[in-house]
Swiss-Prot record:
Domain of life: Bacteria
Organism for this UniProt entry: Pseudomonas fluorescens
Region (Disordered): 131-156
GO biological process: cytochrome complex assembly
UniProt protein name: Cytochrome c-type biogenesis protein CcmH
CDD domains, per the entry: CcmH_N
Length: 156
């Protein structure tokens, strides 16, 4: 009885982990590679920042199954991506395409960085070239007094 229980404990967890893995039969290695690339490129609609290859959500399982079906029908990668974008929106792509809607996503950070550098350059330039209105200039009497003070200090 103890041996049977020990065997069940040792073999049981391995079977549970094995049952959770999706298995698909591919025609060739190129198709398997395309499937892997597509599932890594597409984001799970339910999960935040997780691709459908790594997600355990039911919708990710459905999307993997759908990609496998479309690959079997002979559709190319762009057709599959277009289908997913039409169905779930641009959010489903980790790297959204450069369009009018996504231009701000691609160029916004660089534009903000450039604007910050320009603002800093203007501030520095204005501080360096601040015009003196003569308020800090010494009058002839003050200059004479300053020279006297400096001369007495050097004589000591």
């Amino acid at each position: 009885m103890k041996r049977l229980l020990a065997a069940a404990v040792c073999l049981g967890p391995g079977r549970c982990g094995h049952a959770a893995i999706d298995t698909y039969e591919f025609a060739n290695d190129a198709e398997r590679e395309r499937f892997r690339d597509l599932t890594k490129e597409l984001r799970c609609p339910k999960c935040q920042n997780q691709d459908i290859a790594d997600s355990n959500a039911p919708i990710a399982t459905d999307l993997r199954r759908e990609i496998f079906r479309m690959l079997g029908e002979g559709k190319d990668d762009q057709q599959i991506i277009d289908f997913m974008v039409d169905r779930y929106g641009d959010f489903v792509r980790y790297k959204p395409a450069l369009t009018g809607k996504t231009a701000l996503l691609w160029f916004g950070p660089a534009g903000l960085l450039l604007a910050g550098v320009v603002v800093m350059a203007v501030i520095v330039r204005r501080r360096r070239a601040a015009p003196t209105d003569g308020s800090d200039a010494l009058s002839p009497e003050e200059r004479k007094r300053l020279d006297q003070l400096l001369d007495t200090k050097t004589d000591d």
